[in-house]
Amino acid sequence: MRIISQICIATTLILCGSHSLYAAECSAKSGAATVPLLELYTSEGCSSCPPADKWLSGIKQDASKIIPLAFHVDYWDYIGWKDKFSKAEYNDRQRKIAAFGGAGFVYTPQFVMNGRDFKGSDGSRLNSMIETNQKLASRANLSLDAVTQANGEITLKTSAQAVKPSDAKNADIYVALYENKLVSFVKAGENSGRELKHDYVVREFFGAYQINNENQFSKIFTLKPEWNGRNAGAVIFVQNSQTGEILQSLALKFCNG
């Protein structure tokens, strides 16, 4: 079964006759099976979090099987170390997940699989969850297209469509920009003196967006040139606003120009 198609091609832009500049273009489209979304809520101010961060980094991102994201929360910053990757809006998302019927409260480190509290960061349980999800038919068609322009900017085109119009009613669409291979040298707080390494860190988060009356969603994001050359990519996912269930998710690593 073809789950994900991803294409990276070099595109030549011809300017002023004899001058040519190059841009990199990447694209991805979702397939017939549901790809699970695994979220980690973590903080550099939490002494229990580094093992969870390391475990998440060890997950090979096979975009046809699982999509990991790490949301750094800021409610531990008061202990003495401000996590530079944290945002208050990620706290809000974690609380919303708790309200869906997950753990019922927020804590770190917390893993969330498809909108539900996921305990037990062991490979066997994760593989079981992946296999279960791959048996579920996708309820949304997603696409991501990223073009690195000649000036270094990245144009990210996103689109979503519900497989069945009935699924569009409570469908919330989110777009995340993530970055890998991040390193921090912690100088205060519970992890003082430690070097922490992170992957799949959410640097920007957009949404919720909705599917229109024609069962369509599309939006274009223009990313600044500093995103070019980073170990980064984008994720789009559709979540039921009433239950927290993930209808489909899709990841794309940027092709650098």
Located regions from the model:
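Positively charged n-region of N-terminal signal peptides that target proteins for export
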Residues: 1-6
